[in-house]
């Protein structure tokens, strides 16, 4: 980052949300209260698995906006209307009847699990929740596989269940019965369930250690199909997988399973292709917006990654019903990348201070003192945020500008803090770095925007949680994002002279000299953060379930985006984009 040593222009900011709260009381719908807030007028100045090796990508490589728009204009790719075929509707109704009439609990749970893995569960949310409510109390004679599957499904879907159900599989010394290691499928089910454990749930920690050791030991002797499943789960358990990538991978795998349903496989492929067509419509809108915005034409140093931005939104919000939310979130992420590049690679310190103060003021006159390239970025942020606020106002009658604006101010101040650290040579401790890094990674910004864009379960009481200090749920998810970002990009950022990463800071504070050991320690910290995150799912939370799921999905997407390894579960972002958005099933 180009910088001078003049810090005198950096003014202290006041909290932009001061005075916007009413009296405390019981939670109530927030519509009338939010309508009292003001909204600025908009001014206009004018992106879990790789494809199988045997499956060819039948689409051209998408390298820039022009090639993307050209591809999306093809009528066979982007139809005028998305066809909802009679066959697909028939298969959906047939599946619904089967789900509703399956009486045996284990078979019903297996069907729910399969629907979720294939990406079809969103069609049957009410039926699934009704069934899961009935599974809250297990049977005294249920085996390890059944108990573990029941636990995982209930907790994953936000239902309360106590891990003490596994005590029946332990001996008098409080250890898991040794004979369980002969039940490979039961062990596998318990292994997957153990990853939903929260801090303090020692029985699940013990279950993880017990199952992981025995599954690794038994891996060489397992039949190939089961061995592949176990190997992939040891690398990335189900609980941490990105939903749409898991659907892609499992659809490819499901047809080879004994006893699979041909109807369900056909439905999964038809539905995947339909959702892919929806994603192409969304990409078309985002790409046209990005091209019209013209940021990277004027700011040639900035990243041009609408496809990657959209991949993030599909990871965070996989359900088709959130189409408009994905579009708006992708816009904010794209602008965030440009601002990050301004602070990291282009702006002088004096310019960054001017930009920070202009964002704090949040009015058009504030940009008069900015250099031209910053004015363009400022207007893009100003207009886009106000447009999002206007859409929320039209849809729900809520005026949310104070909240969205505050997240951008927090983030810009976080970037400015990092710039001052780099300029003065200050080395933060790891906690300082990570806490600020959650802000600059955009975690708080994205989740606060989504809270209002999703618009479910919004009350005056839970809106009060959306300011500093942000909810722990947001912080845990954001810390996982920050740490995975560092694991994936630390080397490149160090080469261009950026701040030390969390890996470097942790190694320095703990006298670690091996990079490999340092990375392993960061992975352990991520594991502990997942336990904290799971605790938010267990607790009775004031935030709506939809935003809780979005926070979990952000953590899931961060590992998929930043961990790329050959010959493993993980692949490159380009492969994910091709598989999700441009390669339909036959």
Curated annotation (Swiss-Prot):
Catalytic activity of the protein: (2E)-geranyl diphosphate + H2O = (2E)-geraniol + diphosphate
Positions that bind Mg(2+) 3: 485, 489, 493
Matches recorded under InterPro entries: Isoprenoid_synthase_dom_sf, Terpene_cyclase-like_1_C, Terpene_cyclase_plant_C1, Terpene_synth_N, Terpene_synth_N_sf, Terpene_synthase-like, Terpene_synthase_metal-bd, Terpenoid_cyclase/PrenylTrfase
UniProt motif DDXXD motif: location: 340-344
Protein name, UniProt field: Monoterpene synthase TPS4, chloroplastic
Domain notes: The Asp-Asp-Xaa-Xaa-Asp/Glu (DDXXD/E) motif is important for the catalytic activity, presumably through binding to Mg(2+).
Top-rank lineage group of the source organism: Eukaryota
Residues that coordinate or bind Mg(2+) 2: 340, 344
Protein family (similarity comment): Belongs to the terpene synthase family. Tpsg subfamily.
GO cellular component: chloroplast
Subunit structure: Monomer.
Residues that coordinate or bind Mg(2+) 1: 340, 344
Cofactor: Mg(2+)
Gene Ontology molecular function terms on file: hydrolase activity; magnesium ion binding; terpene synthase activity
EC number: 3.1.7.11
Gene3D superfamilies: Farnesyl Diphosphate Synthase (1.10.600.10), Terpene synthase, N-terminal domain (1.50.10.130)
Pathway assigned in UniProt: Secondary metabolite biosynthesis; terpenoid biosynthesis
Targeting presequence: 1-47
Entry's Gene Ontology BP terms: diterpenoid biosynthetic process
Cofactor note: Binds 3 Mg(2+) ions per subunit.
Compartments it resides in: Plastid, Chloroplast
Job of this protein: Monoterpene synthase involved in the biosynthesis of volatile organic compounds. Mediates the conversion of (2E)-geranyl diphosphate (GPP) into the acyclic monoterpene, geraniol. Does not use (2E,6E)-farnesyl diphosphate (FPP) as substrate.
Keywords: Chloroplast, Hydrolase, Magnesium, Metal-binding, Plastid, Transit peptide
């Amino acid at each position: 980052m180009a910088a001078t040593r003049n810090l005198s222009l950096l003014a202290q900011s006041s909290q932009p949300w001061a005075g916007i709260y009413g009296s405390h009381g019981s939670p109530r719908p927030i519509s009338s209260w939010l309508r009292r807030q003001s909204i600025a007028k908009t001014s206009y100045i004018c992106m879990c698995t790789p494809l199988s090796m045997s499956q060819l990508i039948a689409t051209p490589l998408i390298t820039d906006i022009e090639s993307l728009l050209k591809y999306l204009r093809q009528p066979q790719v982007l139809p005028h209307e998305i066809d909802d075929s009679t066959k697909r509707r028939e298969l959906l109704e047939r599946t619904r009847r089967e789900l509703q009439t399956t009486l045996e609990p284990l078979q019903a749970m297996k069907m729910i699990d399969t629907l979720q893995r294939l990406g079809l569960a969103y069609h049957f949310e009410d039926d699934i929740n009704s069934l899961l409510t009935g599974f809250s109390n297990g049977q005294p004679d249920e085996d390890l596989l059944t108990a573990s599957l029941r636990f995982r499904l209930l907790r994953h879907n936000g239902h309360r269940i106590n891990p003490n159900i596994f005590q029946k599989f332990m001996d008098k010394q409080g250890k898991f019965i040794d004979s369980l290691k002969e039940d490979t499928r039961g062990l596998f089910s318990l292994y997957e369930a153990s990853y939903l454990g929260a801090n303090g749930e020692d029985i699940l920690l013990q279950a993880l250690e017990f199952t992981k050791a025995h599954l690794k030991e038994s891996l060489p002797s397992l039949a190939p199909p089961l061995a592949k499943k176990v190997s992939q789960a040891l690398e990335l358990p189900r609980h941490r997988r990105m939903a749409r990538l898991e659907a892609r991978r499992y659809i490819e795998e499901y047809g080879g399973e004994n006893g699979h349903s041909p109807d369900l496989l056909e439905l999964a492929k038809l539905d995947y292709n339909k959702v892919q067509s929806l994603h192409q419509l969304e990409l078309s809108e985002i790409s046209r917006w990005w091209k019209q915005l013209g940021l990277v034409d004027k700011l040639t140093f900035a990243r041009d990654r609408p496809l990657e931005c959209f991949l993030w939104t599909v990871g965070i919000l996989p359900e088709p019903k959130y189409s408009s939310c994905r579009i708006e979130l992708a816009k904010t992420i794209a602008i965030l990348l440009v601002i990050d590049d301004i602070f990291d690679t282009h702006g002088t310190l004096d310019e960054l201070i001017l930009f920070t103060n202009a964002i704090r003021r949040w009015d058009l006159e504030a940009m008069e003192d900015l250099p031209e390239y910053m004015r363009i970025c400022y207007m893009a942020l100003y207009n886009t945020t106000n447009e999002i606020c206007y859409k929320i106002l039209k849809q729900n009658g809520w005026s949310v500008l104070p909240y969205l604006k505050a997240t951008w101010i927090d983030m810009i101040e976080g970037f400015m803090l990092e710039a001052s650290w780099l300029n003065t040579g200050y080395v933060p401790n790891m906690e300082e770095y990570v806490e600020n890094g959650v802000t600059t990674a955009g975690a708080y910004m994205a989740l606060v925007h989504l809270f209002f864009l999703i618009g479910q379960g919004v009350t005056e009481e839970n809106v009060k949680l959306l300011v500093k200090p942000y909810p722990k749920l947001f912080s845990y998810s954001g810390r996982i994002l920050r740490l995975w970002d560092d694991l994936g990009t630390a080397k490149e950022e160090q080469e261009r002279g950026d701040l030390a990463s969390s890996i470097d800071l942790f190694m320095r504070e703990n006298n670690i000299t091996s990079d490999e050991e340092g990375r392993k320690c960061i992975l352990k910290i991520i594991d502990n953060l997942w336990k904290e995150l799971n605790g938010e799912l267990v607790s009775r939370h004031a935030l709506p379930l939809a935003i809780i799921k979005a926070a979990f999905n952000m953590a899931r997407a961060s590992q998929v985006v930043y961990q790329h390894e050959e010959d493993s579960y993980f692949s490159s972002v380009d492969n994910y984009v091709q598989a999700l958005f441009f390669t339909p099933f036959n």
